[in-house]
Amino acid sequence: MATSASSHLNKGIKQVYMSLPQGEKVQAMYIWIDGTGEGLRCKTRTLDSEPKCIEELPEWNFDGSSTFQSEGSNSDMYLVPAAMFRDPFRKDPNKLVFCEVFKYNRKPAETNLRHTCKRIMDMVSNQHPWFGMEQEYTLMGTDGHPFGWPSNGFPGPQGPYYCGVGADKAYGRDIVEAHYRACLYAGIKIGGTNAEVMPAQWEFQIGPCEGIDMGDHLWVARFILHRVCEDFGVIATFDPKPIPGNWNGAGCHTNFSTKAMREENGLKYIEEAIEKLSKRHQYHIRAYDPKGGLDNTRRLTGFHETSNINDFSAGVANRGASIRIPRTGGQEKKGYFEDRRPSANCDPFAVTEALIRTCLLNETGDEPFQYKN
């Protein structure tokens, strides 16, 4: 399995320089989503002092013609800070800054789905929507070969790898542990992690997060994972079906509740939400991967713990359904439900916005409603 050339550089030499004092100056790494809707970009600027809140961070710009976001003749795009975290790579007082992207005319870029998501979340803030997203991913070599897999064959069939322990069952735990600790340091609401069903496949959970925080925290957790993998010389892919055949795909199961669902007899509101979702299946399928459902076509086959992409289904503790109600929720008559349809490479802003539109704003039909400002 191939690893990157950069990972073979002497990290001890780098540490000599990273341990130098930086005075009062602060490095702020600005992060944004590029024109693919999946890729992340970043660049760093120096600040004169440590910012205490997002309002203290300046706007910036970048060349959108190099990120699939504009033409060269009018390429400047604006970076508007939206969320700030501690930097686990450069450490305090340095920052990671997640940004929204705006075009030259100050309109949101096509892949800036945070902008409308924030408006929708503000409309239902009194219902306190909580989300938790289960991000699955697969570790690969730079040659595209799954991490730890035999070079000329396949590992043993699925079965022993889920939550597995041992060198023959857990592939790449060092990366998982490094990512987990880096997220905790950064202030990401990471809930846990586990090895998944396919060897070299892992999962981390983000949440519970209220409203717009869900997308901010998951995107920055993804960024941190990519940076950790960069240090180890490997790749983390969010492809929903990285290996064809009898291997599990990768999803981003999304858990959702409102204040009413979490309180006594909240199961009534959970069931009402599921009924609304059942009538808007195709709208959600289009929102749940960046290619309008094409990526999920490879994953949602009705096999490997998935539902069929063409059918809506729901059930208690049923991992072959579109929507799963956890057994505890069925017993306690309150809690949350899990939408198992989002793909691993989904945009969490698109997913959470779609859930709010259908379940709380009572939208119907195949298109989102256009609200007036």
From Swiss-Prot:
It comes from the Eukaryota. The modification Phosphotyrosine is found at Y104. Mn(2+) 1 binds at E134, H253, E338. Glutamine synthetase activity is inhibited by methionine sulfoximine (MSO). Residues 113-373 form the GS catalytic domain. It is a lipid-anchor. InterPro entries: Gln_synt_N, Gln_synt_N_sf, Gln_synth/guanido_kin_cat_dom, Gln_synth_cat_dom, Gln_synth_gly_rich_site, Gln_synth_N_conserv_site, Glutamine_Synthetase. One of its GO terms (cellular component) is endoplasmic reticulum. GO terms for molecular function: ATP binding; glutamine synthetase activity; metal ion binding; protein-cysteine S-palmitoyltransferase activity. The modification N-acetylalanine is found at A2. ADP binds at Y336, F337, E338. It catalyses: L-glutamate + NH4(+) + ATP = L-glutamine + ADP + phosphate + H(+); L-cysteinyl-[protein] + hexadecanoyl-CoA = S-hexadecanoyl-L-cysteinyl-[protein] + CoA. ATP binds at E134, E203, F204, Q205, I206, G207, P208, N255, F256, S257, R319, R324. Pfam families: Gln-synt_C (PF00120), Gln-synt_N (PF03951). SMART domains: Gln-synt_C. Its EC number is 6.3.1.2, 2.3.1.225. The modification Phosphoserine is found at S343. Palmitoylated; undergoes autopalmitoylation. Its cofactor is Mg(2+); Mn(2+). Residues 2-25 are annotated as: Required for glutamine-induced ubiquitination by CRL4(CRBN) and proteasomal degradation. Decamer; composed of two pentamers. Interacts with PALMD. Interacts with RHOJ. Interacts with BEST2; this interaction tethers a fraction of GLUL to the membrane, causing a decrease of cytosolic glutamine synthase (GS) activity and inhibits the chloride channel activity of BEST2 by affecting the gating at the aperture in the absence of intracellular glutamate. PANTHER family: GLUTAMINE SYNTHETASE. Belongs to the glutamine synthetase family. This is Glutamine synthetase. It comes from Sus scrofa.
